[in-house]
Amino acid sequence: MESHNVSAFTTLNVPSTVGNACGIDFSQDGIFLPVLYGIFFIIGTPLNLLALFGLYKLIQSENVLPVYVINLLIADLIQLLTFPLWIDYYANGHYWRFGPRSCQFMGLFFYISIYAGIFFMCIIALERHLAIARPLSFKHLRNLRFARWIALGIWILIAVPPAIAFDKLFPKQENYTLCIEKYPSEGSFITYRLITLLVSFIIPLSFIVGLHRETVRSLMAINSLSSEEKRSIRGLLTLLVAVFVTVLGPYHFIGCVKYVGLLIHSSACIWEKAVFVPYQLARGFLSLNSLLDPVFYIFLRRDFRDVAGNYLPCLKRMRTRSCRTEKTTISSQGCD
């Protein structure tokens, strides 16, 4: 569901055929996207699997947060598993060699994973807010059974609508070789994309930023939590906001520029060519979350400081210097 009416597939060597009437040079992203997706796949797959294994052991009846993070990582894994075929597609100049049905499935899985990840990040922020700001009012909702139902509901909410409209969104056309793309985009699809960009970024970002502010404010007033626990909670919420702004932000911003431009620009093809490279770059970095999301596991560990030090050596060195400074200060005070 991209810059494109999902009526996907055109013959690569004839740029004026259906799907690429603009004659866009698809070699422009033929190195960048395959290399980037290859890096994400090689590093992200084992990283997410290891984090999933660790999170599974953290699930307790009174701690449901790992359930939502596990589902976030499952969404990342689904996305990562589509990369080998996308690597082949982009390396061959947007030429899909695996048939229209596999394109339909890969496109569906890819975007379901993106939007499921966004929804689960919102749920993680909400769960932390309820646990900190309203622990008694919503205690009955913070149990494993309820968390599993919430997770299942999110997957259904994300997957069922496109599945129902499967043939309409991803029509099966045997003679085309573009996948999930058409240039220029059509009016109805442009409107659809602008709506999805609003629902999948502007609203969730406002929701997460608002919860971050309120949760941190409530956290400062709580004396029963240790400084390390507070640091862990703040770190998790800050990571959520950072992922939204730095990873999802460029793609959604350039997407808005692209589709608004298509509505007002006199020549759709000239505009499609102008924004093609920036949009594809942002689309590639959209999957950076597959490397960042496993970091949530660190913030859920009770030995957060030690684990963070092992994963992030710079933090370990800073902690060592801090301890040395503290010991020196205490020693000098003792001599006085």
Predicted regions located by residue number:
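Loop architecture of class A 7-transmembrane GPCRs
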Residues: 14-26, 90-113, 134, 139-151, ...
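Residue-level signal for the membrane-embedded core of alpha-helical transmembrane segments
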Residues: 43-46, 78, 113-120, 206-210, ...
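Extracellular N-terminal segment of 7TM GPCRs
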Residues: 1-50, 183-184, 192-193, 197, ...
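Extracellular TM2-ECL1-early TM3 structural module of rhodopsin-like
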Residues: 29-38, 62-124, 131-141
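Intrinsically disordered regulatory tails of 7TM GPCRs
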Residues: 1-24, 227, 231, 267-269, ...
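Class A GPCR helix-loop hinge within the 7TM core
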Residues: 114-152, 214-216, 220, 297-305
